[in-house]
UniProtKB/Swiss-Prot annotation:
Membrane-spanning segments: 9-30, 52-76
Keyword Membrane in record: yes
Protein name: Endothelin receptor type B
Protein family (similarity comment): Belongs to the G-protein coupled receptor 1 family. Endothelin receptor subfamily. EDNRB sub-subfamily.
Organism encoding this protein: Macaca fascicularis (Crab-eating macaque)
Recorded name of the encoding gene: EDNRB
InterPro entries assigned to the protein according to its UniProt record, in alphabetical order: Endthln_rcpt, GPCR_endothelin_rcpt, GPCR_Rhodpsn, GPCR_Rhodpsn_7TM
Length: 99
């Protein structure tokens, strides 16, 4: 009932949020390892430039990896017991050579 825009937007947001979560946990694990392995180098309070770069990089990589979801999903009309239903699926035949 929401159309092709929502059909493409929901899988895109799902994939992007999973990517952001996984990459953030990886970055957190690396940061905690560095803090434990070299505890004498812990600096003062604040957000270092490298941390800000990591956060931006995590978001950019996650969004870029989620783009194929937005491209591939589409509203498909299917015949089911004599009635036609429009459902949101990964399109079985892609229109571009990308996928």
């Amino acid at each position: 009932p929401f159309g092709a825009e929502m059909c493409k937007l929901v899988p895109f947001i799902q994939k992007a949020s999973v990517g952001i979560t996984v990459l953030s946990l990886c970055a957190l694990s690396i940061d905690r390892y560095r803090a434990v392995a070299s505890w004498s180098r812990i600096k003062g309070i604040g957000i270092p430039k490298w941390t800000a770069v990591e956060i931006v990089l995590i978001w950019v990589v996650s969004v870029v990896l989620a783009v194929p979801e937005a491209i591939g999903f589409d509203m498909i009309t299917m015949d089911y017991k004599g009635s036609y239903l429009r459902i949101c699926l990964l399109h079985p035949v892609q229109k571009t050579a990308f996928m």
